[in-house]
């Protein structure tokens, strides 16, 4: 059964209160003007953000909602104004959608609470609608549902071509976008707290390395989301930035020169796609490489995407995920991680301050100390940033937020005409050795190689041999 709650009269009154608060805090719906994001009156807005995929899951249990409140409060205190999170959980033991069109009301109310809290703290939301990977169901779960219904589907990438699976996805889009928030009384499609819809987290396609299957899927789904939404919110595809084999595709810059089944330029040109995205994980994508090699990759990767976005897309660009693996004995130390943050955030500010297309980003991922709400330690993945535990990282992020906030409110038309000028940057954290001895370097490199190789092998086997 698809749950479609109707707001009571009290909720309608609450909606007016929340609506006024959100308008004051966030400036209303976000639009685009060339390579800039703008709010009402055509004034620019820049995004200093974070990822917290777990928000809906935590909020679905009233006893753990304190984690959501604390996360938004900590983020807001550091000037963060964008949160990227999941608006899906397909199947599994904590589903939002337990089977096609069947929704768990407690989980949906968790998402209601997340949106209401984001409003209260003046933070926009980038809501992702499904996953390329198996975490929280994703495309493979949709294919399983169709196969269980008697359709002859055998691989996860059938998600992109099966008419049945595509109908399931469209139904989910409609269920989410037309949902009326039980806290605020506002339909999601009408809520200015929601910055944009993301079609999928990190779409990839082994079945068609040229990117044609993903391209066709995005060309169908982006306009569909726009129609259901009424064109009020922005839409993006969710790409990591990998190049394909099409025109203006700098495929030689892909990690190891490999195709991932997407086309950065062509897909972001699709009708209904309002802005471009890239991700940045040089230590995973280039496992076993040196810090200098990763730094060179970062510079080329960022420079190329900023250029291509300006030259061939004319749209804004966000780094919607960036992170540095930080696990004792297996990843970078904090000094190296904080240096990485400095470099990424300086690149964002350099572009934004000169009127370029790279106008924001979101680090992966924000967590809280387990003392705040039990269970947080279970979400650690080596990339987490706990602001209360890492004063230097918190300072870097907070300073960057202040820098971007100083650019907010400019006239987008005037910004396009601005002459390019040098931009100030953060104070750099010295990379140094940070205590990373030669004795630890080899085990760390081997672990990162093992993790990356294991993920690749697992993904290949699941896609080609063990769907069910």
From Swiss-Prot:
Protein's gene: MAN3
Top enzyme class: hydrolase
Distribution of this protein across tissues and organs: Expressed in seeds.
Cellular compartments annotated: Secreted
GO molecular function annotations of the record: mannan endo-1,4-beta-mannosidase activity
EC number(s) given by UniProt: 3.2.1.78
Family stated for the protein in its record: Belongs to the glycosyl hydrolase 5 (cellulase A) family.
Top-rank taxon, per record: Eukaryota
Any single Gene Ontology cellular-component annotation: extracellular region
Ranges annotated as biased composition (Basic residues): 416-430
SUPFAM superfamilies from the UniProt entry: (Trans)glycosidases (SSF51445)
Catalytic activity: Random hydrolysis of (1->4)-beta-D-mannosidic linkages in mannans, galactomannans and glucomannans
Protein name, per record: Mannan endo-1,4-beta-mannosidase 3
Pfam families named among the record's database cross-references: Cellulase
Residues bearing glycans: 152, 300, 333
Active-site residues, record numbering mapped to chain: 202, 321
Signal peptide per UniProt: 1-23
Region annotation (Disordered) ranges: 415-436
């Amino acid at each position: 059964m698809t749950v479609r709650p109707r707001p009571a009269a009290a909720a309608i009154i609450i909606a007016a209160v929340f609506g006024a608060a959100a308008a004051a805090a966030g400036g209303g719906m976000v639009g685009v003007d060339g390579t800039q994001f703008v709010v009402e009156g055509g004034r620019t807005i820049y995004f200093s953000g974070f990822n917290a995929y777990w928000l809906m899951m935590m909020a679905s249990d009233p006893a753990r909602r304190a984690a959501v409140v604390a996360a938004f409060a900590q983020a807001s205190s550091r000037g963060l104004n964008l949160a990227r999170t999941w608006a899906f959980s397909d199947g599994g033991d904590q589903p939002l959608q337990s089977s096609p069109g069947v929704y768990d009301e407690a989980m949906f109310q968790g998402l209601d609470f997340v949106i209401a809290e984001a409003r209260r703290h003046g933070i926009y939301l980038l809501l992702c609608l499904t996953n390329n990977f198996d975490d929280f169901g994703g495309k493979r779960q949709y294919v399983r549902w169709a196969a269980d219904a008697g359709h002859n589907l055998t691989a996860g990438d059938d998600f992109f071509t099966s008419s049945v699976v595509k109908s399931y996805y469209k139904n989910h889009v409609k269920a989410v976008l037309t949902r009326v928030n039980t806290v605020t009384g506002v339909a999601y499609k009408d809520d200015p707290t929601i910055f944009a819809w993301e079609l999928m987290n990190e779409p990839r396609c082994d079945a068609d390395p040229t990117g044609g299957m993903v391209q066709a899927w995005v060309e169908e789904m982006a306009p569909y989301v726009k129609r259901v939404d009424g064109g009020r919110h922005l839409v993006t595809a969710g790409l990591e930035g990998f190049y394909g084999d099409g025109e203006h595709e700098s495929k030689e810059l892909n990690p190891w020169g490999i195709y991932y089944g997407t086309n950065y330029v062509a897909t972001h040109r699709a009708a209904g796609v309002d802005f471009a995205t890239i991700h940045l994980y040089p230590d995973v994508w280039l496992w076993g490489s040196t810090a200098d090699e990763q730094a060179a990759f970062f510079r080329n990767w960022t420079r190329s995407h900023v250029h291509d976005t300006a030259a061939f897309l004319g749209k804004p660009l966000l780094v919607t995920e960036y992170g540095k693996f930080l696990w004792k004995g297996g990843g970078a130390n904090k000094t190296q991680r904080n240096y990485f943050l400095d470099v990424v955030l300086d690149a964002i500010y350099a572009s934004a301050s000169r009127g370029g297309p790279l106008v924001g980003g979101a680090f992966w991922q924000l967590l809280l100390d387990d003392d705040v709400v039990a269970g947080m330690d279970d979400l650690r993945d080596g990339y987490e940033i706990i602001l209360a535990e890492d004063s230097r990282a918190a300072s870097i992020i907070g300073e960057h937020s202040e820098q971007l906030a100083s650019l907010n409110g400019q006239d987008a038309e005037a910004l396009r005409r601005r002459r390019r000028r040098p931009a100030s940057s953060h104070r750099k954290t010295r990379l140094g050795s940070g205590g990373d001895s030669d004795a630890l370097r080899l085990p760390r490199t081997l672990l990162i190689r093992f993790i990356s190789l294991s993920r690749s092998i697992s993904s290949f086997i699941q896609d080609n041999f063990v769907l069910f």
